[in-house]
Amino acid sequence: MKDNLVCMGIITSPHGIKGAVKVKIFTEKPENISLYGKLISGSKNYDIDSVSVIGENLVIATINGVNSRNEAEFLRNKKLYVERNKLLKLNDENEFYQSDLVNMEIRLENDELYGYIKSIYNFGSGDILEISVISTKKNIMLPFTKEIFPYVNIKERYITLNMPEFIG
């Protein structure tokens, strides 16, 4: 079942005294978090009643049945998932969800296996891939651009790396 779920956000803290929570959102449009229906965390489902965007990837949400700060406190650090079939269908083969990239192979242009995508970050200026390099057993971070990663194959689960000279 875990493969069928996509993480949409994480509850970071309670907000106020009436049970609202702050949620860090991992979707392109944070205000749409309530449109996916029930969100799953562990064995529980949550319905988002209302959402107010307070930052680029941060919202204040009210959750059905959570009516006090104490109840909201129990939700701190809970990841919120949605079933993959609830996501919007992608129109183009060059479109994909970031969650699809995690654990994908990184191959060099000669098809040699270089490493695996460990995580994806965005610090404000674009997506950064954290790559676990097989040969050095270390992690590196590279900007996720078309120049550095010219080809993404979702079906076969690999990305081609055009190795920047400074990495060698």
Swiss-Prot record:
PANTHER family: RIBOSOME MATURATION FACTOR RIMM. The keyword rRNA processing applies. The PRC barrel domain binds ribosomal protein uS19. It is found in: Cytoplasm. Pfam families: PRC_RimM, RimM. GO terms for biological process: ribosomal small subunit biogenesis; rRNA processing. This is Ribosome maturation factor RimM. Belongs to the RimM family. HAMAP family: Ribosome_mat_RimM. The keyword rRNA-binding does not apply. GO terms for cellular component: cytoplasm; ribosome. Residues 93-167 form the PRC barrel domain. Keywords: Chaperone, Cytoplasm, Ribosome biogenesis, rRNA processing. The gene is rimM. Its main location: cytoplasm. Disulfide bonds: none annotated. An accessory protein needed during the final step in the assembly of 30S ribosomal subunit, possibly for assembly of the head region. Essential for efficient processing of 16S rRNA. May be needed both before and after RbfA during the maturation of 16S rRNA. It has affinity for free ribosomal 30S subunits but not for 70S ribosomes.
